[in-house]
C-alpha cells in the first residue's frame, strides 16, 4: 500500500523492560528515587538513555502506530508494558498541558500524539466466544480498554478498532491465509476506518476536576462503556 515502516521488535532488540534510575542519565531528584520526577527531569534536560530517545523519535515520525502482541494473562507481555513505562516520559506522553478548573492537562483526546492513529493487533489462544459479551473471560473490548483508552487515547492517539485473532495455536494454513488477508485489508484502510468513539476529557463530557461523567450523560449507567460516545 506504499506505507513507510519502522519496526521495533522488542525481543530482537533485547529491550530492557524495567524502568529504573539508570534510564535518566542524571542524579535522582531528591533523597529518594521518584520515577515520575526522574522521568520529567531526564526528558527536559535531554539525558534519557539512547534507546528511549530512539523509540520516542519513531513515535513522532509515525502517523500510525501498530502494537502487535499475544494476549498473555489478559494483557500485553511485560516487555511491551516496559516499553510503555520507559518511552512514555513525563513531558512527552503525559504531564503536558495546563491544569485549571476548565482544562485538566492535555490528555484523553489531546496531547503529544493528536493527529496520529494507533491500533492493536492481538493474538489470543482462546475462542472468540470466550471473549464475547457473555464469555467467561469477559468482553475483549473490556480487556483491552486499559491499553486502548489508557495507553493510546490518553496521550492523544485516535484509536482504531483492534484486529484480534483467536485460537492462534490451532491456526492451519487456510486460516492463516485468511488472517493475512484480513490484516492486509486493515492496513489498506487505516485512514478510512472510523476510530473508537472515546469521549474527550476536556470537551464538556466530564466534570473538572473530579473527571466524572456528567450526570445527564448515560444516566443511571456505569462501567467502561459510558466512556464511549453514543451519538
Q: Residue ranges of each PLM-predicted region?
A:
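Short aromatic-enriched loop/helix-cap "lid" or pocket-rim segments at secondary-structure transitions
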Residues: 17-22, 131-133, 174-176
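Short, glycine-/small-residue-rich phosphate/pyrophosphate-handling segment
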Residues: 95-153
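Well-ordered beta-strand positions
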Residues: 64, 117, 161-162
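N-terminal beta1-alpha1-beta2 submodule of the flavodoxin-like/Rossmannoid cofactor-binding fold
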Residues: 1-96, 181-231
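C-terminal/domain-terminus segments
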Residues: 1, 136-141, 173-181
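Basic, glycine-rich
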Residues: 165, 169-172, 185-188
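Generic structural signal for helix capping and beta-alpha/helix-loop junctions
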Residues: 15-17, 128, 169
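Short beta-strand elements in bilobed, periplasmic/extracellular small-molecule ligand-binding domains
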Residues: 5-8, 158-166
Amino acid at each position: 500500500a506504499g506505507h513507510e515502516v519502522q519496526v521495533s521488535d522488542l525481543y530482537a532488540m533485547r529491550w530492557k523492560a524495567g524502568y529504573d534510575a539508570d534510564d535518566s542519565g542524571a542524579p535522582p531528584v531528591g533523597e529518594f528515587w521518584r520515577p515520575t520526577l526522574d522521568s520529567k527531569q531526564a526528558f527536559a534536560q535531554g539525558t534519557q538513555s539512547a534507546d528511549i530517545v530512539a523509540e520516542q523519535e519513531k513515535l513522532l515520525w509515525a502517523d500510525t502506530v501498530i502494537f502487535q502482541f499475544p494476549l498473555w494473562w489478559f494483557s500485553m507481555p511485560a516487555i511491551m508494558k516496559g516499553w510503555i513505562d520507559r518511552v512514555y516520559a513525563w513531558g512527552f506522553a503525559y504531564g503536558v498541558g495546563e491544569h485549571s478548573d476548565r482544562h485538566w492537562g492535555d490528555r484523553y483526546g489531546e496531547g503529544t500524539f493528536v493527529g496520529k492513529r494507533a491500533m492493536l493487533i492481538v493474538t489470543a489462544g482462546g475462542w472468540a466466544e470466550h471473549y464475547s459479551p457473555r464469555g467467561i473471560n469477559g468482553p475483549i473490548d473490556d480487556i483491552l480498554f486499559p491499553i486502548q483508552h489508557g495507553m493510546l487515547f490518553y496521550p492523544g492517539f485516535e484509536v482504531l478498532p483492534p484486529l484480534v485473532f483467536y485460537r492462534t495455536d490451532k491456526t492451519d494454513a487456510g486460516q492463516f491465509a485468511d488472517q493475512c488477508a484480513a490484516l492486509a485489508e486493515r492496513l489498506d484502510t487505516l485512514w478510512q476506518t472510523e476510530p473508537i468513539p472515546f469521549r474527550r476529557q476536556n470537551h464538556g463530557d466530564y466534570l473538572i476536576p473530579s473527571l466524572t461523567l456528567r450526570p445527564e450523560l448515560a444516566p443511571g449507567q456505569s462501567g467502561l462503556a459510558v466512556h464511549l460516545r453514543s451519538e
